[in-house]
Design a protein with these regions (language model features):
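Bimodal "functional hotspot" detector
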Residues: 1-144
Length: 144
């Protein structure tokens, strides 16, 4: 028979940036968990669109941001991004972009560290951000 697409609602904590792009601000959102899209991919894509009701938030990601794949293995979330991640967001520091993703992913409790690749390759530097190819853990010092 046909495989039904299962879904349930889950509350997740997402990290957006403030208007000046130098601090992270978290907020809770509801996500519809689908069995055909990994939760990790879904929450990353949600970072492109802050809730309309929160006027003080902006997206830490460019609108052409795209996730190729996410996978959880050994408490690590492996995230393969498209090269669009290299398009800097106006007025947002790279470390804010990176840790918005890392903090959001590690808050899901499926992994405590994140390994990024771009189109399948480890990239040591993302614009101004060094060590983009290392295992990254959450950073709350950037939170407002």
């Amino acid at each position: 028979g046909e495989k039904s697409i299962y879904s349930e609602k889950k509350k997740v904590k997402l990290y957006y940036t403030n208007k000046t792009g130098d601090k992270l601000i978290s907020c809770f959102r509801e996500v519809e968990v689908k069995n055909n899209v990994p939760l990790e991919t879904q929450v990353l894509l949600m970072l492109k669109n802050p809730p309309a009701s929160k006027k003080n938030l902006k997206s830490p990601l460019s609108q052409d941001f795209h996730v190729n794949q996410t996978q959880i293995m050994n408490n690590t979330c492996y995230v393969d991004l498209s090269s669009d991640i290299e398009n800097a967001v106006a007025d947002v520091k790279e470390k804010i972009t990176v840790y918005a993703m890392v903090n959001t992913l590690t808050d899901l409790d499926t992994a405590y560290q994140v390994q990024f690749t771009i189109d399948g390759k480890r990239v040591s530097k993302l614009n101004e951000f060094e060590k983009f190819d290392t295992l990254l853990t959450s950073n709350f010092s950037l939170c407002k």
